[in-house]
Amino acid sequence: MTPENFAAIAAEGYNHIPVTRELLADLDTPLSCYVKVANGPYSYLLESAAQGGEKWSRYSMVGLPAKKILKVFGHEIVLEEEGVEVDRFECTDPLEYVEQFQLQYRYPPIEGLPIYTGGLVGYFGYDSMRYVEKRLADSTPPDVIGTPDILLMVSNDVVVFDSVKGKIHLITHANPENAAAYQNAQERLDEMVGKMQRNIPASVLTPEKGPVVHEEDFVSSYGEEQFTHDVDRIKDYIREGDVMQVVLSQRMSILFEGEPLNLYRALRSLNPSPYMYYMHLDDFHIVSSSPEILARLDNGAVTVRPLAGTRRRGRTETEDLQLEAELLADPKEIAEHLMLIDLGRNDIGRICKVGSVEVSEMMTVERYAHVMHIASNVAGAIVESGSAMDLLRATLPVGTLSGAPKVRALEIIDEFEPEKRGIFGGAVGYLSWNGNMDTAIAIRTAVIKDHKLYIQAGAGVVADSVPALEWKETMNKARSIFQAVAMTESGLGVRDSSENPRMSNEDEERVVVPGDASA
């Protein structure tokens, strides 16, 4: 962009103008770029592996440390700039505040830019649903971890990798109200280029080893006895016709002194997934390899994609195909998947144009490193007055993390789960400056805070659930994090099961409870 182009766009009234530079992407990876240019508080790395983890998707995003941060605790808004709190106030509707906050950044439509150039990046926790479902506003379980209900970074300096075109886009933003804005933006891009040319620190190349980790070292805040007892109590609700399904979850924790970035490196190696993210949020970190979209808005097109129904991967291609056929022939799996499709259609139907909602992909099988899931695509066209926040209000939390009917299931979750879910089950991703949104469900996700690592997983309780198998299902879903922690503490060396037999992958022999692939 030339100074003349910049001035012309500014004359149209835009105050948040992207200024970019391109490099070849043949000498760096998104991970090495993150280490060199971003690794610090309020930074992030977003990556994506295609189905099965066999190849990486087109775009990866690196966010440099953000200067402005928006946090929400209940109904209290906290604004920070460069590490200093600048405002704190009460707000009736935090979701409405977030929407209005973003509108102050007037972003121009410019062709030729990558799908993402920056925006509000972070998460909306599971408990954000209480801003929408007023009857649940006062039933929040105790908050043990203490993370904000919402945290969003104002991400203006980003590096976007385009693996198809082999390019790296360096992007910053400038406000023309500052006479030197364009020149300052060019200087920031120069600085980014300089950082890209650095060497990777030796500490990253030689990670330290920690203690040997076993699965039983993770401590549940729920406990198997109480969890299985509560599964039976939920089945009573189901028999009485009060609810059809409830996704009950348990949280596990372990002392963790390792580097969170190394945990991400381990997890992306062990379990590549469509939504992989590492977020350094000052006093805590989020590390995740989520298989499931929560909601996406792309130029008016709405997408949700229920995952429900699970089988392990076969040891051979023949066995893999046999397990797929078994999965698609299981009437219980199919019935529960159809229920979740209906929930998705109902959710987005509230904010989409009449007649636009359709099931664009029906019950395909997606394969990942250890499991396969039934997946369907539900799509629609958002109403003319609709926004990304309207879509988030309509979909959070998704049925695969709550149950059906949704509101009654949410009430039952509050009744039984001993701790506030927090980030688990919420939405992690971005609201881009151009009005689009892409968010994943916060599952297969570790939260690291105060030298402890937390992982949470759930199971869908239905009328014929076996309590012991529901408990086992939560353990199986957490296993990718268990293994990643063990690999991190080994110095990122790969331990096989003979070296650490209690961390073996029981997915090979597990019994799968139908209909709860996501949680």
Give the positions of each predicted feature.
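Extended alpha-helical targeting/anchoring segments
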Residues: 1-519
